[in-house]
């Protein structure tokens, strides 16, 4: 079978899909590891691990009260 320039065979397309999927898996693993390290660092400093929940629960208000003292 002859392919025009720029066209890929089915095997090459599968390889590209596999490479892209592998890259995505690695990126997700790195992001997850970074989040985990960040959360552990925050816990060691005595802060809640999830800053989004912290803000939703009034963490900003607690900080303001603390600053007034």
From Swiss-Prot:
GO annotation, cellular component aspect: cytosol
Alphabetized GO MF terms: protein kinase A binding
Tissue: Preferentially expressed in the neural tissues.
Region (Disordered): 39-69
Compositional bias of kind Basic and acidic residues: 41-50
Paired cysteines (S-S): none
Organism superkingdom: Eukaryota
Example GO BP: negative regulation of protein-containing complex assembly
Quaternary structure annotation from Swiss-Prot or TrEMBL: Binds cAMP-dependent protein kinase (PKA). Interacts specifically with RII-regulatory subunits of PKA (PRKAR2A and PRKAR2B).
Domain notes: The RII-alpha binding site, predicted to form an amphipathic helix, could participate in protein-protein interactions with a complementary surface on the R-subunit dimer.
Function (record text): Protein kinase A (PKA)-binding protein. Binds to type II regulatory subunits of protein kinase A (PKA) and may block the A-kinase anchoring protein (AKAP)-mediated subcellular localization of PKA.
Protein name: A-kinase anchor protein inhibitor 1
Organism of derivation: Mus musculus
